[in-house]
Amino acid sequence: MDPKVNVVPPALHLVDPQIQMTITRMEDAVVHDQNNAGPKVYPIILRLGSQLSLSMAKRNLDSLEARAFQSTPIVVKMTKLATTEELPDEFVVVTAK
């Protein structure tokens, strides 16, 4: 098994790694694909908290301080299940406000 496949920063508390959301605001997506107008779909990692906000992150950056940037709120909808093995380099992190 590839050790890089299931890497999750320990600061992220997994509630359910099998949840996926669809980003419906393309300007907030990490991947800037101007040729594709359809919504990008990224697996998400849930963090414990009553209120939720979205931020984008790259899992392959070295430090937690460098890995994330805040985005404006993103309109999302639940889609099909995804496992942590399917996480791309860019994924959505849901954090408590």
UniProtKB/Swiss-Prot annotation:
The gene encoding this protein is included within the N gene (alternative ORF). This is Protein 9b. It is a peripheral membrane protein. It comes from the Viruses. Its main location: host cell. The lineage of its organism: Viruses, Riboviria, Orthornavirae, Pisuviricota, Pisoniviricetes. Homodimer. Signal peptide: none annotated.
